[in-house]
Curated annotation (Swiss-Prot):
PANTHER family: LIM DOMAIN-CONTAINING PROTEIN (PTHR24211), TESTIN (PTHR24211:SF1). This is Testin. Interacts via LIM domain 1 with ZYX. Interacts (via LIM domain 3) with ENAH and VASP. Interacts with ALKBH4, talin, actin, alpha-actinin, GRIP1 and PXN. Interacts (via LIM domain 2) with ACTL7A (via N-terminus). Heterodimer with ACTL7A; the heterodimer interacts with ENAH to form a heterotrimer. The lineage of its organism: Eukaryota, Metazoa, Chordata, Craniata, Vertebrata. It comes from Felis catus (Cat). Keywords: Cell junction, Cytoplasm, LIM domain, Metal-binding, Repeat, Zinc. One of its GO terms (molecular function) is zinc ion binding. Pfam families: LIM, PET. Scaffold protein that may play a role in cell adhesion, cell spreading and in the reorganization of the actin cytoskeleton. Plays a role in the regulation of cell proliferation. May act as a tumor suppressor. Residues 92-199 form the PET domain. Gene3D superfamilies: Cysteine Rich Protein. Belongs to the prickle / espinas / testin family.
Length: 421
C-alpha cells in the first residue's frame, strides 16, 4: 500500500466506545464521544481511558502491533481472518480453597495479566510484591489501573500513523522510520527470574554487590562458602536495596545482565508508574514507558497528544503544538495572533473565557475581563474600579483602603457592618 493510500485510510475510530459513561464525571457526562482530533471526550473533556469502554481487544491489537517485527513475536498471534497481530497476554487464574462452617468452597482469582513464566508460583509471588491497588485482578482497582496505564504509556498514535490526524505522506514515512528505530534500539519486555538464576546468565559475567561485574577468572578464585555468599549479594538497580534470596526479580535484557529490579521498582523514570505488562524502553541507563521515551526523542503536540514530525510547529506556555492545533480548548478556534487565557494548562480564547471561566464581580455581577485589574479575597472578586469595589453599606470606594469582608460583602468600618447586620 503506497503512502497516499495509507493517508486516505486513516481514521480515529470515532464509533469505538460511543456513549460509554465517564467513571470520573459520572452523570455530568452525557456519554463518550471522541473529539474529531483531540484524544478526549467532546462532552466532558476526559480521556477515553476514564470512560467505561471495553478495550481489551483493541489494546491487544495495539500491543500486538508494537511487538510485530521484533524479537517478541512469541508474544503475539495473527488472526486468521485479517492477519492482524494480537497480543497473547498471559492470564492467570488461581483457585484458593476457602473453609466454611459446613464445607469448603473455592475462591477463584483471575489476573488479567501475569508474567509469562512457567513457574506459576513465581508469577504469584511477583503479583504479591506489587501494591495491592496495582495488582490486575479482574474487576478490581488494579485492573482499572492497568487499563489506564496501557492507554497512557503506550498510545496507539505513537506507533500507528493510521491513528493520527491528517499526517502528510512525508510525516507518515518519518513516523514509520521512527517506530522501526525504537523497536530495534529501545523496546524490551522484562523477564521475571530468581536472582540466583542470573549467575548462569550473560557472557562470562556474574552479579556482585552494587551491580559490579566480575570475570570468570574472579569467579574461579572464589571457594566454598565465600563464593556462595558472593552469589547471593544482589541489589535493586532502582532503590539500591538488597534482593532477598528466593524473591522474584525483573531482568531487562537491554539494560544488561548486571541489573535487576524489585517488581514494584520496575517503573518509568519519568512518571514513576509501574511499567505496564513489564514493557519498557531503555535509554541512557534509564527505563521509560513508551510515552516518555517518545517524549525524549520528539516534541509532542499539547493539542492532539501526537508526536510532531513536521519541521514547522509552535511553542507556547512551555508546550509544543502543531500549527493547526494551537486552538481554543473550548471552541477549537485557532489562536494564532489572538488573545488567550490559560485555564488548567489549556489555552482558551477570550470570548470562551468570559463565557465559561471568568469570575463574576461581586459589585456589578458581570464577568471580569481577563485583561482588567481585579481585587480578590478568598473566593470573591471585584472589578478594581470606583464603581464596583465599594462599601456594601455607604458605597465608599475601598481601593487602597482597609476593609472588612463578610460573606461576599465588604465594609469600610465596624459601624457600616453593624448597620447591615
Amino acid at each position: 500500500m503506497d503512502l497516499e493510500a495509507k493517508v486516505k485510510k486513516m481514521g480515529l475510530g470515532h464509533e469505538q466506545g460511543f456513549g460509554a459513561p465517564c467513571l470520573k464525571c459520572k452523570e455530568k457526562c452525557e456519554g463518550f464521544e471522541l473529539h474529531f482530533w483531540r484524544k478526549i471526550c467532546r462532552n466532558c473533556k476526559c480521556g477515553q481511558e476514564e470512560h467505561d469502554v471495553l478495550l481489551s481487544n483493541e489494546e491487544d491489537r495495539k500491543v500486538g502491533k508494537l511487538f510485530e517485527d521484533t524479537k517478541y513475536t512469541t508474544l503475539i498471534a495473527k488472526l486468521k481472518t485479517d492477519g492482524i497481530p494480537m497480543y497473547k497476554r498471559n492470564v492467570m487464574i488461581l483457585t484458593n480453597p476457602v473453609a466454611a462452617k459446613k464445607n469448603v468452597s473455592i475462591n477463584t482469582v483471575t489476573y488479567e495479566w501475569a508474567p509469562p513464566v512457567q513457574n506459576q508460583a513465581l508469577a504469584r509471588q511477583y503479583m504479591q510484591m506489587l501494591p495491592k491497588e496495582k495488582q490486575p485482578v479482574a474487576g478490581s482497582e488494579g485492573a482499572q489501573y492497568r487499563k489506564k496505564q496501557l492507554a497512557k504509556q503506550l498510545p496507539a498514535h505513537d506507533q500507528d500513523p493510521s491513528k493520527c490526524h491528517e499526517l502528510s505522506p512525508k510525516e507518515v514515512k518519518e513516523m514509520e522510520q521512527f517506530v522501526k528505530k525504537y523497536k530495534s534500539e529501545a523496546l524490551g519486555v522484562g523477564d521475571v527470574k530468581l536472582p540466583r538464576e542470573m549467575d548462569t546468565q550473560g557472557p562470562n559475567r556474574m552479579l556482585l554487590p552494587g551491580g559490579d561485574r566480575s570475570t570468570t577468572a574472579a569467579v574461579g578464585a572464589m571457594e566454598g562458602k565465600s563464593a556462595e555468599h558472593k552469589r547471593t549479594q544482589y541489589s535493586c538497580y532502582c532503590c539500591k536495596l538488597s534482593m532477598k534470596e528466593g524473591d522474584p526479580a525483573i531482568y531487562a535484557e537491554r539494560a544488561g545482565y548486571d541489573k535487576l529490579w524489585h517488581p514494584a521498582c520496575f517503573v518509568c523514570s519519568a512518571c514513576q508508574e509501574l511499567l505496564v505488562d513489564m514493557i519498557y524502553f531503555w535509554k541512557n541507563g534509564k527505563l521509560y514507558c513508551g510515552r516518555h521515551y517518545c517524549d525524549s526523542e520528539k516534541p509532542r503536540c499539547a493539542g492532539c497528544d501526537e508526536l510532531i514530525f513536521s519541521n514547522e510547529y509552535t511553542q507556547a506556555e512551555n508546550q509544543n503544538w502543531h500549527l493547526k492545533h494551537f486552538c481554543c480548548f473550548d471552541c477549537d478556534n485557532i489562536l494564532a495572533g489572538e488573545i488567550y487565557v490559560m485555564v488548567n494548562d489549556k489555552p482558551v480564547c477570550k470570548p470562551c473565557y468570559v463565557k465559561n471561566h471568568a469570575v463574576v464581580c461581586q459589585g456589578c455581577h458581570n464577568a471580569i475581563d481577563p485583561e482588567v485589574q481585579r481585587v480578590t479575597y478568598n473566593n470573591f472578586s471585584w472589578h478594581a474600579s470606583t464603581e464596583c469595589f465599594l462599601c456594601s453599606c455607604c458605597s465608599k470606594c475601598l481601593i487602597g483602603q482597609k476593609f472588612m469582608p463578610v460573606e461576599g460583602m465588604v465594609f469600610c468600618s465596624v459601624e457600616c457592618k453593624k448597620m447591615m447586620s
